């Protein structure tokens, strides 16, 4: 299975460690994995101009780093979203990517999704609801959510749990 991990964090700390643990577990199980650093990309929010559903034929009118993300999004069997919680939500970069893939509607190939979240405080409910809504709308089967809070972030026990989760896919 081909897996794309969309890391929404602009930093190299907790979420990056979770994404790396997932990658290690998935590759150990024989899957092909690509990690995309969405948190470092310049992706604008959706303009709701509907160009993509008319003249654009599935392509967004905006020219930004979404173009770097789309090949992996379109060619993967599974998409893993990874993000720290910033003010009760995934990062703005990941949210912009979620909005902008509206241009294609549903993923061309992907059938599965998972979510990795890190937080200092553990306020995950809004981000999980947003992910589940996105998965339901796009027809992706939710394979699970892994969270790490405070001291758990980057702990070997938590990273081992994430590796094991990825190996079982």
Stretches found by the model and what they are:
Residues 86-87, 121:
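A short acidic, glycine/proline-enriched capping/turn motif at secondary-structure boundaries
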Residues 37, 146-147:
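Residue-level recognition of beta-strand->loop/alpha-helix junctions
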Residues 1-82, 88-99, 103, 153-169:
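N-terminal beta1-alpha1-beta2 submodule of the flavodoxin-like/Rossmannoid cofactor-binding fold
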Residues 105-146:
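Short, glycine-/small-residue-rich phosphate/pyrophosphate-handling segment
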